[in-house]
Amino acid sequence: MTFLALDVGNTRLKWAQYEAPAVGARLLAHGAVFLENIDRLAEEEWSEMSPPTRILGCIVAGDAIKRRVTEQMELWDVVPRWVVSSPQEAGLTNGYEHPARLGADRWVAMIGARHRLLARGISKPCIVVMVGTAVTVEAIDASGKFLGGIILPGHGIMLRALESGTAGLHVPTGEVRDFPTNTSDALTSGGTFAIAGAVQRMVENITRHCGEPPECIMTGGAGWKMAPSMSVKYELVDSLIFDGLLEIASRRFAP
């Protein structure tokens, strides 16, 4: 019973095929394409893949992209299922005012992070950081309740906003410096420090609320860019959403 996990973000579609819809299942194949190229999946990357028995994905890219992805999966006789945030799943309690409005990628990443810690015998508060087109910073207490989270622009959105609203800021991407002395470095450093500062603030908030410092897990396509500038101890995990999808699938598709 092979299992296909899908993570459809704002920029790319990432996929991973596993031997089974179970935690710890062997990874058989994986890949990623930009959204403008998803219409080639059935003819290219997925054409030689063994047909999956189960498909589960999370998507934040909107209904038009979802339809295009679904069309590509018509080469298999399998109906994909999509994660919608719920009041509770896989041991995580959703503290959002309207649970279904929480982004599916945020929900799945938190489930992945929570179980990653539990598998190591760690039952502590946790901060989950996703660095992509947008940046999210989530807080989970030791009991597994999602307390709340923040959303801020990613590096690219910050720079484009400044370029469109300020004359003379169409400059090349710079480097992160403690004390930038040119506009390129000033812009890149400012965006990086804004994200790092948001994470630091959420760490302080949850430490005060829970009475102990949290674990911090970071993921996302641009997570590596943040790594050198983080002021808190963290773990960088590329596969966090796939980890969460496996946790959910192991329950939904249990024999």
Curated annotation (Swiss-Prot):
Where is this chain's protein located in or outside the cell?
Cytoplasm
Which keywords fit this entry according to its UniProt record?
ATP-binding, Coenzyme A biosynthesis, Cytoplasm, Kinase, Nucleotide-binding, Potassium, Transferase
Record's GO cellular component terms: cytoplasm
The pathway to which it is assigned is: Cofactor biosynthesis; coenzyme A biosynthesis; CoA from (R)-pantothenate: step 1/5
Q: What is its EC number?
A: 2.7.1.33
Q: What reaction is this protein's catalytic activity?
A: (R)-pantothenate + ATP = (R)-4'-phosphopantothenate + ADP + H(+)
Co-factor binding details: A monovalent cation. Ammonium or potassium.
The record's annotation in InterPro entries points to:
ATPase_NBD, Type_III_PanK
What's a Pfam family this protein contains? Pan_kinase
Q: Name one GO molecular function term.
A: ATP binding
Family from the record: Belongs to the type III pantothenate kinase family.
Q: How does it assemble?
A: Homodimer.
UniProt protein name: Type III pantothenate kinase
Source organism per UniProt: Polaromonas sp. (strain JS666 / ATCC BAA-500)
Lineage here is: Bacteria, Pseudomonadati, Pseudomonadota, Betaproteobacteria, Burkholderiales
